[in-house]
Amino acid sequence: MADDNEFLAIFECVSRFSGATVQVVIDSIMRMTAVPAMERIARLTDGMPVRVQWAGIPTLEWQKTYGLQQPLVELHERFIEEGRDFWTGYAHVPVVVTASIQQSLLFAQSNEYVWHEVVSAETDDEKRSLLNDSDWRARARSSWENDSLETSFFREPSGMMLDNSENDSDPIVSLGDYAMKLGLHPSDALAEWFLHNGLSSTVSMPPWDQDDDMVIRLTRDPNAVGNINDSGAHGQMFCGSGDSIRLWTDYVCSGKLKIEEAIHSQTGKLANHFGFSDRGEIAVGKRADITVFALEEVEHRAKYKVYDVPNDDGGFTWRWTRDPAPVRLTLCNGIPTFDKDGVTGAMPGEMISPS
């Protein structure tokens, strides 16, 4: 845990560079320390010319129900009243994660530390030994029922999808149905599924219910930054890229947002936030970074695996991806990179810096 002096050193350094941004992720899922964490950041940056992007105001229904949302909304409004250069981050899609026993923080983040022992085991033989061990299974059942967070996915196995078998031994099915078929506790059934389908198999967790009203409010808020998605950094943990278009399919097509509001929040608003004054809107003198699409043609496509990520053995491992939405044309610096025939192969992009 960084102390105040360490944070101050960072903020003082950043304040010397015009256009620089400090990004802060606060905890409104596990330890629920979001409010005191942001109050601390606000105190330490008081009087400094520092732009802070903080993530952010929760947009999940359970976070609203648990009283986590309103105090952060009040902080957001206070920062605006004080004239702080604070930008509130949010996501327009609910959190969807994938659990793995090879590499995953999900079990520990859910207070499911008995299952995390399997993740921490260094070899596949050690993992199999734990999954087969009757004493470990008893502890895992108890932890599943009593220690896992009430808001964790493990409390609702009917929504956990066994949809990524390493060896394709079993069809896609929910953990709840799989446990019922085997006549086992969900924890035992999950252990059996990994043993039968391969230790590199993964489980997709159900999305939490989204607070649409808050998403709409923040999309329209000039001091909020949307379109947050870290799927590019977690190719095997989160769903593949493409969730940005759900702002169109879920909110524009349903009439909850105007198309102009959605597009501005993903283009000009973000360009302005990061200091890219030469792009983000269609105007004379701006870079021609343009996407052309017909809204009725756009869909949020199903995810699937492609094996094109280099691994440490000289081969390739997999990642999630999706088929094109599609859009009709993508221009970068005025040059098509995607058109009716697919990817063009052109790479006209350049390194950019804030202006």
Language-model segment annotations:
Residues 168-169, 271, 319-322:
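Short loop/turn motifs at secondary-structure junctions and domain boundaries
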Residues 201-209, 215, 258-261, 271-305:
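Acidic, glycine-enriched loop/beta-strand segments at the rims
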Residues 217-224, 243, 291-342, 346-348:
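C-terminal cap of metal-dependent C-N hydrolases
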Residues 26, 55-56, 191-192, 261-265, ...:
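Beta-strand segments within the central parallel beta-sheet cores of soluble alpha/beta enzyme folds
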Residues 15, 46, 195, 223, ...:
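Hydrophobic alpha-helix feature that most strongly marks membrane-spanning transmembrane helices
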Residues 23, 53, 87, 227-228, ...:
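Structured core elements
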Residues 89, 183, 230, 262, ...:
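Divalent metal-coordination and catalytic microenvironments
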Residues 1-15, 25-250, 254-255:
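Active-site neighborhoods of metal-dependent hydrolases
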